[in-house]
Amino acid sequence: METSTISFSSSSPPSPPPPQPAPGDIDAVSLGRLSRNLENLLDPAFLNCADAEIVLASGGGDPGGGAVVGVHRCILAARSRFFYDHFSSAPAPAPATAGDKPQLDLDGLVPGGRHIGRDALVAVLSYLYTGRLRSAPPEAAACLDDGCSHDACRPAIDFVVESTYAASGFQISELVSLFQRRLSDFVNKALAEDILPILVVASTCHLPELLNQCIQRVANSNLDNRYLEKRLPDDLYAKLKEFRVPDEPHSGILDPEHEKRVRNIHKALDSDDVDLVGMLLKESPVTLDDAFAIHYAAAYCEPKVLAELLKLESANVNLKNSSGYTPLHMACMRREPDIIVSLIEKGASVLERTQDGRDALTICKRLTREKDRNEKSEKCKERSKAYLCIGVLQQEIKRRPQILEDQMSAEESIATPLLVDNFHMRLLNLENRVAFARIFFPSEAKLVMRIAQADSTQEFAGLTSANFSKLKEVDLNETPTMQNRRLRERLDALTKTVELGRRYFPHCSEVLDKFLNEESTDLILLESGTAEDQQTKRMRFSELREDVRKAFTKDKAAGAAISSSTSASSSPRYETKLRPGNKKGKLSR
C-alpha cells in the first residue's frame, strides 16, 4: 500500500523584520541617555567621584548644610570657556594638600556669587553637563501660599535671579538670554518690592533693556524713597530717583526741616541709640508716627531696638505708610519672628491688609519656599525663621477667629484707599447675593436688609447694572475719606445682611449658596453645549427652582406661629421679630 505524504506549508509570506530606527533617531536616543547619565554625577546620592568643589556663600540658602557642590573639572573645562580659563590658570595644589579637592569660592568666582543658592547653581551646572535645562524644582521655586499661581511669587523670581547670576558669571550666553526673557515677564506681573532683586541682577550682569524696564516700573510704583534707599545700591538708587516725580506721595517729604528731623531719628536708629531718639522726640514736634519710626525699626533694626522704641511713647502700631504697609507687614517682609511677636504684643493686627489685599500671613507665605517650611525638623534642632514667623501668625489668627472672616470691615482706619480690585470683587459678590435673595425671597430679604440698615443706603436701592457700575465712579464732590467711609459702610451693611439671613432663614440661605455655586444656573449656559447637555442643564435648573420654593415654604412655616400673634400690618411677622418681648428660638437655630 502506498502511503501519501501531506506537507503543510504556510501560504502567507514571512513577517517583515522590525523597522530599524533612522540614524537620526539613534543619535537622539544615545544623546538622551548620555545626558541622563552625566546628570547623575551632580546627584548627591550618586557615587562621589568629583575632583573639585564649589563653595556657596552662607550655605547657599539651605540652612543646616548643602554649602558645597562637587564638580568635575574635565567636564566643565570641556563645556565652558570660563572654566577652561579658570582651571588652566589656577596654580597647582601644594604637595601637602595634593590629595584634597580644590575648592572654588562662588562669592569670589563670579559677580553676584553670594546671591546664588544651591538649587540654581545645580540647575546651571546641569545644563553644562547635559546640554539641557531642566525645570525648576517646585520646592525651590514655589511659595507656601495655596492661593498663589507661582508664576511671579518671590521664590520663583529668586530662583531665576540666582540662575541669571550663575549663567552670566559662567558666560553661558544662551542661558542669559533665556533668563532675561523670564525676568522681563516677571517685571510685568510681580509686586513692586519683588522687582528690586531683578533690578540689581540686571545692573550687575549688564542687561540694559531689563534694567530700564525695572527702573520704569519701580519709579512709577508707590514704594517710598527711604525703602528704596535701604534696599538698593547707591548708584541704582540715584539713577532711580531721576525718574521719580518729586511731589509724588512716595517721596515722603513735607518740608526740608521736617525731612531733616526724620532723617536724624532714622540715623539714631541705625546706631541703635534709642536714648538719642527719645531726646530728638522731645526737642521737636515730630512724633514716632510722623517719622514712621516703628516701620523703620521693624524693617532695618535689631529686635531689641524695636522693643526699646515701643516703650518710648504711644505709637500706632497699625499705622500704614505711604505704600500701604503697617510695621507688621514690614517685619513679615523681613521674616524676623522676634519683631513680629513684639509688634503683636503691642496690639498690631495680623488682619490688616495691604492695598493689594495681602495680610501678614500671606506676605510671609509668599516669601517662603516650600523647602523652607521645615515642618519635619528633628527634636532639639532649630527651625527656620520663616517657619517660626508663619507659626506665630497662624496661632494669632486662631486666637481671634471671630474677626477673621470680617477683616475688611474691622479695620479702624478709613483714610487708606480701598479702590482695589479684590475689595470691589468682594463687594460685588455680596451685592449679587443680596440681589438674588431679593428676587427669590423678597419678604425675608427686606426684613434682614432693614435690620442691617442696608435698605436705607441709596446704593442698594436698585438691581440694574447701572447701579453696580457706580462702584468705580468718581464723585468730584466726594473726598477720598468720604468715599472710603461710604464703601466701608456699604460692605458692612451687606455683610450684616448675609449674616442675618443665615441666622434667621437658614434654609433659604442654604439654597441660595447652592444656587450661586451651581454653574448650570447661569441662564446663558442653559443654551450652550449639545442638545443632551442643554436638557441636563434645564433639568438641574428646574430642580434648583423647586428647592427654592420648598425652602421658602419651610422658613415661612417656621415663622407662622410668631406671625399669627401680631396685629395686621404690611409685613406682620417681620415686625414681630423686631420687638424685644417675642421669642426667637425657632428662627435662630
Curated annotation (Swiss-Prot):
Region Disordered, annotated ranges: 1-25, 555-589
GO CC list: nucleus
Organism: Oryza sativa subsp. japonica (Rice)
Mapped ANK repeat ranges: 260-290, 292-319, 323-352
Name this protein carries in UniProt: BTB/POZ domain and ankyrin repeat-containing protein NPR3
Domain writeup: The BTB/POZ domain mediates the interaction with some component of ubiquitin ligase complexes.
Keywords of this entry: ANK repeat, Metal-binding, Nucleus, Plant defense, Repeat, Ubl conjugation pathway, Zinc, Zinc-finger
Pathway linked to the protein: Protein modification; protein ubiquitination
Binding residue positions for Zn(2+): C143, C148, H150, C153
Keyword set includes Chloroplast: no
Ranges of biased composition (kind: Basic residues): 580-589
InterPro entries: Ankyrin_rpt, Ankyrin_rpt-contain_sf, BTB/POZ_dom, NPR, NPR1/NIM1-like_C, NPR_central_dom, SKP1/BTB/POZ_sf
GO MF terms, alphabetically ordered: zinc ion binding
Biased composition (Low complexity): 558-571
Stretches assigned to the BTB domain: 52-137
Gene Ontology annotations of biological process type: defense response to bacterium; defense response to fungus; regulation of jasmonic acid mediated signaling pathway; regulation of salicylic acid mediated signaling pathway; systemic acquired resistance, salicylic acid mediated signaling pathway
Sequence segments annotated as region (Salicylic acid-binding core (SBC)): 382-521
Zinc finger regions, C2HC NPR-type: 140-154
Designated gene of the protein: NPR3
Positions annotated to bind salicylate: R433
Family assignment from sequence similarity: Belongs to the plant 'ANKYRIN-BTB/POZ' family. 'NPR1-like' subfamily.
Role description: Salicylic acid (SA)-binding substrate-specific adapter of an E3 ubiquitin-protein ligase complex (CUL3-RBX1-BTB) which mediates the ubiquitination and subsequent proteasomal degradation of target proteins. Involved in defense response against the bacterial blight disease caused by Xanthomonas oryzae pv. oryzae (Xoo). Plants expressing an NPR3/NH3 transgene driven by its native promoter show enhanced resistance to the Xoo pathogen, and exhibit elevated sensitivity to benzothiadiazole (BTH) treatment and enhanced induction of defense-related genes upon treatment with BTH.
Self-association state and partner proteins as the record states: Interacts with TGA2.1, TGA2.2, TGA2.3, LG2, TGAL1, TGAL4, NRR, RH1, RH2 and RH3.
Location of this chain's protein in the cell: Nucleus
Ranges annotated as biased composition (Pro residues): 13-22
